[in-house]
Every structure is written in structure tokens, then in C-alpha cells.
Amino acid sequence: MRRLTALLAALLLLAFTGCAANPAQPESTSSPAQADETQADFQVESAYPLEYAKEFTVDECTGGTRLITIQNARYLVVPENSTVPNGLSEDITVLQKPLENVYLVSTSAMDPILKLDARSAVTLSGTSAENWYLPEAKEAMENGEISYAGKYSAPDYERIVSANCGLAIENTMIYHTPEVKEQLEKFGIPVLVERSSYESDPLARMEWVKLYGILFDKEAEAETFFNEQVQRIRPLLGQDTTGKTAVFFSVTSNNLVTVRKSNDYVAKMIGMAGGEYVFSDLSDNGNNLATINLSLEEFYADAKDADVLIYNSTIEGKIETTEQLLSKCPMLADFKAVQNGNVWCTTQSLFQESMELPDLILDMNRVFTAESPNAVNEDELKFLTHVS
């Protein structure tokens, strides 16, 4: 252990010295250069079929390899006991199976991994046990099957290296600390930055399960799971709107109201469920954020007459009563939905349960189609609870 600690200390000193001499460069936003496959030992044979996802692509290549492209990053997934092709372009990161002792920083990636029964591949977490809302992930950490290895900006390099980490799965927050990504790669740990949160279609977000199927040899399971989830909401697709208007929001501590943009996946789920999103013209304002903060006056003007209010507990905490809601924002007492008792609150697990979006769509459909809030059978709801 002392030799390992000394080695890690030396490696860290060398790595940080390198960082001082070579500052991290900004992440390029240009599309990736194509590999010169005429000089490599593999060829692209066909495109892996994806129906909805736009933020990643997969090419099926010779020798059973898969070439994954996520924005401007490329990853070649090589089967176990297979030789890595020669002549690869320098921008391609090799992921040699089996991928074990994964350092999982992106919380939205845990749910698809759990659904594929691939949790044993994850032994390191960037989220502490108390911040997991997925019972299996929380229990695995409490039982010592998964160790906390530091958040995205401050990983425990010694723990990660000593665990023989085979892959770090990050989200785009890592680009705020590019030196961390660089350090992990200097230790020989490939870093995959997933972008499922940039998908504007709920089905596209769920289709990322296919990427994890490729990484963890669960392709058939991923296809089956995804198709089953799509079938659950297919009866709702193409149906006429219920005419119910809805708002998905939360109130910040500094008296602003956070709502989803009109092109966001939550707004699209409201439409799939038969509702009409109140902020249908709230388009992009030049950043990649899915939300926007409105003043109380702006929110009041547009949302006062909404039929249904859905409070997002994942940001500012859960509310159970109208009194709690009004303590956050007294002016909501004037709102039609508050006066009619048609206010609902999400569970705090909502965004970590990234593969259960059909349940939220079905929950909202039950609310939108009910004759009154009291007619909704709450035992049938997974993500929504009635604010009494």
C-alpha cells in the first residue's frame, strides 16, 4: 500500500506539473474529423439503427467493434480478447471490453445501467449515498459495493487508480474542469462524456440505453427494454389534446420561477400526455439550458389561468400542502389551478429515474383526463403526488 501511495503521489506530481506547463484548451465545438479508415485495421460496415437519439451515433465495424460518436468525441468499443486495430486516428478513444470498475459521475446513466442488470460494472460513484434516489444505487454504496470517489470536479485519484478503473462516465459538467478529464486520461482511464440531457425528445433520452447496452454487452436487453417502454405510451401518441393547459415549474429562494423552455423534453411530455404547455413560445435564448428563470410578474401573466400546476421538487425540494406552496410564493393563491386544487408535485427521484419517462407521461395523462383532481387514483401514479 505504501508503494502504491508513493507511486500515485509521484504520478500526481508529474501530472500536475504537466498541467501547469500546458493549460487545458477549450473544448472544440466543431464536428470530429473522420478517421482515415484506409490506414486502419477496421472498416465501417453499417450504421447502428437509432430511432430518436440525435446526440450520439454508432457505426458497426469489422471484427465486432463499434465506433461511438458523441458530439466531437469518438470511442471504439473493442470486444473482449480482441486485438485493438492498428492505425487508428489519434482522436479515437479505445474502450476495451470488459469495462469494469466504472467511475460513474453522470447520475442519469445509472438507471439504464440498472435496467440492463449491469450494475456490477460500476464500483465507483461521483455521487454520495445520501444523494442517490435510486434504491439499488443507494444500497450498493451503503453495502460497500460502490465506493464514493469524489464529485466530477474533485475526484479521488488514488482511489480511482487503485481500483483499476476501466472507464469514467461523465456528463458535460466535466467541461467546467477540463483539467480533471485530462488527469484521468493521463492515468490511462478513458473518459466518456454522455449528452443524454441535451436530447429534446423523451424517447431520444431513453434510447441512450442502447449505448450502455453496447458498452456492457447487453445490446439485446437494451433493444427489448426500449421497445417495451415505447409501447407503453404508443396508445397516447397521435391522440387529440385534452385542452388542459399545464405548467411545470419551481420557485427559487430569490423569488424567481424556473420553467422549462418550449423545446424541452418535459414540455414535449406534457403534449404527449394530452396537455398543452403554457409557455409554448418560450424558445431558446442563446444557451443550452433547458430552463429559464422568469420574474414573478412574468410567470403570473402567463400561468395564472393554467388548469394544472406541476411543481418540480428536484430543484427546490418537495411540497405536500398548498400552505407550503404559498409560503414560497403567496401570489399563487390567485391561480386557477390552486383555487381548483389541481396542483401536483414530482418525486425527487424523477430525473435520476431517466428510463421511467413513460410513467411520468402516463401520470400526467391521468391528471389531464380526470374529471376533477379528486377523481385521480393516486395509487396509480408513480411520479406525481397531489398537493392537498
Label the model's feature ranges:
Residues 13-18:
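C-terminal motif of bacterial Sec signal peptides marking the signal peptidase cleavage site
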Residues 199-231, 308-388:
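Structured C-terminal subdomain patch of bacterial secreted/periplasmic proteins
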Residues 1-12:
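Positively charged n-region of N-terminal signal peptides that target proteins for export
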Residues 70, 76-161, 167-174:
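A short, structured surface patch at a secondary-structure boundary
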Residues 101-104, 121-125, 167-171, 191-194, ...:
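Structural recognition of the beta-strand scaffold that forms the well-ordered cores
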Residues 100, 108-114, 125-136, 176-179, ...:
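Extracytoplasmic ligand-binding site segments that recognize negatively charged/polar headgroups
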Residues 19-110, 220-248, 372-388:
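Bacterial Sec-exported substrate-binding components of ABC uptake systems
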Residues 238-323:
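Flexible, glycine-rich surface segments
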